[in-house]
Amino acid sequence: MAKKTKKAEEITKKFGDERRKALDDALKNIEKDFGKGAVMRLGERAEQKVQVMSSGSLALDIALGAGGYPKGRIVEIYGPESSGKTTVALHAVAQAQKEGGIAAFIDAEHALDPAYAAALGVNIDELLLSQPDSGEQGLEIAGKLIDSGAVDLVVVDSVAALVPRAEIDGDIGDSHVGLQARMMSQAMRKLSASINKTKTIAIFINQLREKVGVMFGNPETTPGGRALKFYSSVRLDVRGNTQIKGTGEHKDHNVGKETKIKVVKNKVAPPFREAFVEIMYGEGISRTGELIKIASDLDIIQKAGAWYSYNGEKIGQGSENAKKYLADNPAIFDEIDHKVRVHFGMTEDDSPVQSELVEEKNEADDLVLDLDNAIEIEE
């Protein structure tokens, strides 16, 4: 019985060695034909961490889970008219430039306001801008910029305005069923691999449409077919909520609006989280406002009555005065911002995504080590 078992083990070992040799030969041939790294074991990847770029909003970074937009992925931002979609995208442009990157803006709607973009912190002298004549031209320009590997962020505003050339050349009233959807589907197939390879973030802004005849469920949909929905790693639903009244002499005027941003799809962190931000007219997202709210909830900033204090020092009576204090003291702002990000694990050393991957890799290494020890003992 023992001889039969030993013989079976020898046959199994021989068969396993042959399979491994065949696999090694196949990998060598693939590497020779397609280059190093064409096929690799997941644990051998040099970069396992999900790299992100801040969205420019602390509340949105928290809602995204990983600390910002994932690099090398597609992001879709959609919502009703005047909800703040372009504002959210422009904050990402400003953040990319702040981090030393290059950003491009494909303005298919031909409606970008340079003065407003500059007010949000965008360096308009360095921003690459294209106003294409057709949808194919806009997507082709985006593709060439991404393929260059020199651009960190590409924003397309908007998918609904990417009109196929055949529709432009035709007459109003002509039927072009599915033409835009086919164009977007082809573009996604071509762009997705290049976006991932170059670690470019591609943000597509989209509008809303309503399905005709829907009596039950949500009648809202986004134009451009389903391809963008499938290829997007992150989808954000932006909705304006309540108006923000001014103070003092502006108390009878609306100076901004509270906006809800819901992460309806997320491939790098848990989805369905929500961020509430204040979009001030002419200024964009109030970074001081969201920081005060979040830090107060975490008791990093203490609130007693109408007074806000930090480290035992009063920083303002009422939120407006506290905002002004943080705006005038950027060092204090950065210090509080850092504490909030550490709390949510969004700093580079404390990223929840990184921690999980490192833990899994350590477990895998321990398992390999245990197997090696077991083989040595058996021999």
Swiss-Prot record:
Protein's name in the database:
Protein RecA
Task: State its role.
Answer: Can catalyze the hydrolysis of ATP in the presence of single-stranded DNA, the ATP-dependent uptake of single-stranded DNA by duplex DNA, and the ATP-dependent hybridization of homologous single-stranded DNAs. It interacts with LexA causing its activation and leading to its autocatalytic cleavage.
Q: Which family does it belong to?
A: Belongs to the RecA family.
Q: Which organism is it from?
A: Streptococcus agalactiae serotype V (strain ATCC BAA-611 / 2603 V/R)
For ATP, which residues are the binding ones? 79-86
Entries under CDD domains matching the protein: RecA (cd00983)
Name the GO terms of the biological process aspect: DNA recombination; DNA repair; SOS response
Q: Does the keyword Cell cycle apply?
A: no
Q: Which domain of life is it from?
A: Bacteria
Classification via SUPFAM superfamilies: P-loop containing nucleoside triphosphate hydrolases, RecA protein, C-terminal domain
Q: Which UniProt keywords apply?
A: ATP-binding, Cytoplasm, DNA damage, DNA recombination, DNA repair, DNA-binding, Nucleotide-binding, SOS response
Q: List localization entries.
A: Cytoplasm
